[in-house]
Amino acid sequence: MNIYNVIMAGGGGTRFWPISRQKTPKQLLNLSGVDTLINETIDRVNKLSHKDNLFIVTNKSQRELMKETVDDKCHHNNILSEPIAKNTSAAIGFAAINIMKKYGDGIMCVYPADHYIKLEEEFLDSLEKAIE
């Protein structure tokens, strides 16, 4: 069974103001000193499956910026723009529909783009157990 990783990255950048804004939302900030939160999330979840199975859900206004930020870590045609920003469940449903149309059945793991995971190995072990 294929594993599809979905990263939700459509936040407007208002909750972390004044550091983040609409043009530089939190997921595009480098808070760890290593990389942006979105790129750290991509690096983490791509250990579970191939980058072909990685999808990012964002909003229309941030799609181009997201493509620049993630560069070659995610296929640009897998960066999905929500037609209308609604909420978390709508973003998950939007990703699920796109994945089902493209690939059919599989396991979809959903992650926020802006979380800091200190114990990465433990996190990945937990995900692998859940997938089994």
Where does each model-flagged region fall?
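Conserved N-terminal catalytic core of the sugar/cofactor nucleotidyltransferase
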Residues: 1-7, 15-18, 22, 33-112, ...
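Conserved donor NDP-sugar-binding/catalytic core segment of glycosyltransferases
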Residues: 131-132
